[in-house]
Amino acid sequence: MDLLFGRRKTPEELLRQNQRALNRAMRELDRERQKLETQEKKIIADIKKMAKQGQMDAVRIMAKDLVRTRRYVRKFVLMRANIQAVSLKIQTLKSNNSMAQAMKGVTKAMGTMNRQLKLPQIQKIMMEFERQAEIMDMKEEMMNDAIDDAMGDEEDEEESDAVVSQVLDELGLSLTDELSNLPSTGGSLSVAAGGKKAEAAASALADADADLEERLKNLRRD
């Protein structure tokens, strides 16, 4: 019947049903063949027994029976082979149908993804990503430059001191000894000269403060 619980069977259910029927038929053929093979052995034993007793008429009759039995065995073997071939074809159909269903699902999913992936939007997203990446690179470069400017002098001074110390160590001297051995400039600096230098430094500092104050006023007016 093509109906199952009031509904029509699917192709997969029909294939499974036919597959079970074919397997059942092959098992029945195997049982019948085994019975005939057992009967064949018994007929051969009876033929030998009757031949020893000299009952040749019975031997001829049993020989014909043996021929028929062997013919039936060959028929059962051939029938089973044909049924097995049909069973393999059904299995191939099931596999092909399963593959077709899987391909159908994959094709549907691919179509959905292609509809969702819109090329202009993707291009816009990629352009925005590149722009943000460039901004990030610029900010990182500016921060690195600022850090280098802030730390550069101190690092250079430390490296210079390290080089001087290394050279003096190689010469077996110390930085303190070298500084103490520097020649004097011919006496101490006069108070007047020191005062002039202090006044010059104070004047330069005042000028710098005035310039900074003027810039701040200009910024407030703007």
UniProtKB/Swiss-Prot annotation:
Q: GO CC annotations?
A: amphisome membrane; autophagosome membrane; chromatin; cytosol; ESCRT III complex; extracellular exosome; kinetochore; kinetochore microtubule
Recorded GO molecular functions are: phosphatidylcholine binding; protein domain specific binding
- What Gene3D superfamilies does the record tag this protein with? 6.10.140.1230
Annotated region Interaction with VTA1: the residues are 217-222
Domain commentary: The acidic C-terminus and the basic N-termminus are thought to render the protein in a closed, soluble and inactive conformation through an autoinhibitory intramolecular interaction. The open and active conformation, which enables membrane binding and oligomerization, is achieved by interaction with other cellular binding partners, probably including other ESCRT components.
Further information in the entry reads: Its overexpression strongly inhibits HIV-1 release.
Q: Give me the gene this protein comes from.
A: CHMP2A
Q: What is this protein called?
A: Charged multivesicular body protein 2a
Q: Which family is it part of?
A: Belongs to the SNF7 family.
Phosphoserine carried by residues: S184, S188, S190, S203
Cite the post-translational modification comment: ISGylated in a CHMP5-dependent manner. Isgylation weakens and inhibits its interactions with VPS4A and VTA1 respectively.
Give positions of region: Interaction with VPS4B.
56-222
Record PTM N-acetylmethionine, positions in chain: M1
Q: What is its main location?
A: membrane
Q: Where in the cell is it found?
A: Late endosome membrane; Nucleus envelope
Q: Which InterPro entries match?
A: Snf7_fam
**At which positions is motif MIT-interacting motif?**
210-220
Tell me what effect the entry lists for L216A: Diminishes interaction with VTA1
- Lineage of the organism: Eukaryota, Metazoa, Chordata, Craniata, Vertebrata
